[in-house]
């Protein structure tokens, strides 16, 4: 298979690494900046903005790729799948219309409401900021304020957590566009990702991501500082009943999309809040999570190229998808000052990483030296029979890096896990 990977982050390095495990797979990559990890795996790369559909389509035709795997959300929103499909390239990724499950928060909520799909929190959509502000002023209780469009995982403000009522009103003024106001959900977050071929849905191991920048879940929201999976592919605060409910919601969404005339193909990412009433949908993403892709793709023991064929041809089957029964812990290194004022162009050096897997993200290689850029730098994944061992592998590797970077030492630790379990019991 000759396959094009679109995107140049840690998630895309994990996708390329998983594809490279298949003998005879030729990888080509289109990305805005040269990712050193992807560049080593690719036969040829094209440096281009990931929303430049002309350049990407021309590169696909020049190289003769038969398939494409789309990593980030921006090219999906721009319609890269529609463009590549028209050029005869089979894509693991949704069309522009289907990607609205992520790129348009109102579309997602309204679809769930129309098809009476479980797990939809109470919500209101406003296109006039004045009406949204009036609703917030009169509403008794806390709300989540979400811009309708893409925000890179950093655009939500939650009353009672990040902002008060006045702060929420100020944020709506700042957005000055469409917003979704939702009931504030209380519980523990978890991620369920699935391969989807338009009809069939094959779930992956559950993952928990950590959005806050600093230890103890403090500080500003980020794109994700790290994540973990358990050896049984569950999470300690998610029951089998909860998992069944979450998967049922995703199956219903895929069926609703097909019924609407937007069949969904690619990766569907469900971010859920496990509440006292069961799982509620925080949001859907139209692609792998970053960092969650690094956990599940490290565990994938079946052939990703075959899975891509199943997605594109509508022949996806759970019998062809298997994951190793092991724990994983992913820890991101980020520049000092991240996310608000990251130190850029700062050299870093990687020490002894042991058995950890390294995934390069927003990092530049200059004359053999790695330098930080403005976002998350690189990630280490530890894989082991137990969570404690996986955490130690990731932590040792992350601690080996010298330079103006930091990471969250608490991700994957028993202490943090115990807090999650205790929090769930309190509900």
UniProtKB/Swiss-Prot annotation:
Binding site for Mg(2+) 1: 271, 283
Pathway assignment: Purine metabolism; IMP biosynthesis via de novo pathway; N(1)-(5-phospho-D-ribosyl)glycinamide from 5-phospho-alpha-D-ribose 1-diphosphate: step 2/2
EC number: 6.3.4.13
Binding site for ATP: 136-191
Residues annotated to bind Mn(2+) 2: 283, 285
Encoding gene (name): purD
Enzyme class: ligase
Cofactor(s) it depends on: Mg(2+); Mn(2+)
Protein name: Phosphoribosylamine--glycine ligase
Top-level taxon: Archaea
